[in-house]
Amino acid sequence: MRRTILAAAVATLAIGVAAQAHENHKHSTNPLVDARQGGMTMLVANMAALTRASQAEEADAVAKAAFPASGVASFARSLPALFGPETKDVAGTRALPAIWDDAPGFAAQVAEFQAATAAVQAAAKAGDKAAFTESLARTKAACQSCHTAFRAEG
């Protein structure tokens, strides 16, 4: 009985927090932009989990990071669709016009990010800490490189 009450209280709290976060989020006029921005928020959380796994001393920490690694790789695969031409002029984003003006350069950055995140996912699935750490560093470098070229400060 106590567990049921506790579970109900936790669920109610979680719903309240999610509802408040939803209220505080500034939505754009484009659902792709909303999806992109939400995905970036999740990417930050997943990258933090991957970083903790790479620094952990537990033997199975990398293998336990397979789920966030999968999320990062999945988001990377979705990036081209999230930066469609209909999102170019949407206000309230930090996406620079260079994304669309230099489409081949942006595509190359996305391809590097996709390759790096696929390597992180494979290394996590295999439980290979050395490959995981290397591919995570490559993923972080790809993030930074793309943000430097294609994201406004702020």
Question: Residue spans of the language-model regions?
Answer:
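Bacterial N-terminal signal peptides that target proteins for export
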Residues: 1-7
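Cleavable N-terminal signal peptides
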Residues: 7-9, 19
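Sec/Tat signal peptide C-region and signal peptidase I cleavage site
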Residues: 15-21
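Extracytoplasmic c-type cytochrome modules immediately beyond a signal peptide or single-pass transmembrane anchor
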Residues: 23-136
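Processing junctions and N-termini across compartments
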Residues: 15, 137-140
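The canonical Cys-X-X-Cys-His
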Residues: 139-150
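Short Cys/His-rich "knuckle" micro-motifs
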Residues: 154
